[in-house]
């Protein structure tokens, strides 16, 4: 199960994961060049972008969406 951390930005959520990812990539739209997981996350209603760090993802959402709804979907994808 991923570990979620709040950030100073209420529309950003840090997700700690247990495996290494390609660092420093920022994704704003789904396309065939993205990793499959990133495309799945970007397609979640309310998510606007995904940033990849060494052992974490940072997901940004539209302000009108609630994290409680988005987190459930993220957990299912991870």
Regions found by a protein language model. Give the residues of each.
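Short acidic amphipathic segments
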Residues: 38-56
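Short, surface-exposed charged micro-motifs
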Residues: 3-5, 48-49
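Short beta-strand-initiation
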Residues: 1, 10, 36, 44-45
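Charge-rich, low-aromatic oligomerization/scaffolding segments with amphipathic character
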Residues: 64-78
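Short, surface-exposed beta-strand-loop junctions and turns on beta-sheet-rich folds
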Residues: 21-22, 57, 65-67
């Amino acid at each position: 199960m991923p570990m979620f951390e709040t950030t100073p930005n209420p529309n950003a959520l840090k997700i700690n994961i247990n495996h290494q990812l390609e660092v420093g990539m920022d994704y704003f739209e789904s396309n065939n060049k993205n990793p499959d997981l990133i495309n799945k996350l970007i397609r979640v209603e309310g998510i606007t972008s995904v940033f990849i760090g060494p052992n974490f993802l940072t997901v940004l959402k539209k302000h009108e969406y609630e994290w409680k709804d988005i987190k459930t979907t993220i957990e299912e994808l991870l």
